[in-house]
Amino acid sequence: MADSSFDIVSKIDRQEVDNALNQAAKELATRFDFRGTDTTIAWKGDEAIELVSSTEERLKAAVDVFKEKLVRRDISMKAFDAGDPQPSGKTYRLTGTLKQGIDTENAKKINKIIRDEGPKGVKSQVQGDEIRVSSKKRDDLQAIIALLKGSDLDIALQFVNYR
């Protein structure tokens, strides 16, 4: 019998993020406590989101609104890295980035967790920005998925191509 395997990836659905951004922009435009603060939210490039407001408190509230919309669209908070508010003239600016892909540092952490705490006979290998995990038994693969979901990593993980 051939080995069973799955891939560990860290990807976000850009369309869902765009929907969350549009919902947040609509709420910021219509909510009473944001009137007169010139609070805006928009894309800045491909992987960054920029929020602008007249006060730092309204800027933090706008970030909370955006995070709430992300959660409702089933996007992990680990995928959005909000920067620090920067004063810019009469306004405050915040640029948040979206994190995708598994970098080498996190790949090493995941491989170490699988090696140290996972069942014996499970092999993992890094393939670009994803990790392929394989084993003879499917139960071992399910144990690895449960182990990684319970671990405290600073990236959002998805498990795909379960064969």
UniProtKB/Swiss-Prot annotation:
Belongs to the YajQ family. One of its GO terms (molecular function) is nucleotide binding. The keyword Nucleotide-binding applies. This is Nucleotide-binding protein MAB_3912. Keywords: Nucleotide-binding. Gene3D superfamilies: 3.30.70.860, YajQ-like, domain 2. Pfam families: DUF520. InterPro entries: DUF520 (IPR007551), UPF0234-like_C (IPR035571), UPF0234_N (IPR035570), YajQ-like_sf (IPR036183). The keyword 4Fe-4S does not apply. GO terms for cellular component: cytosol. Nucleotide-binding protein. NCBIfam families: PRK05412.1.
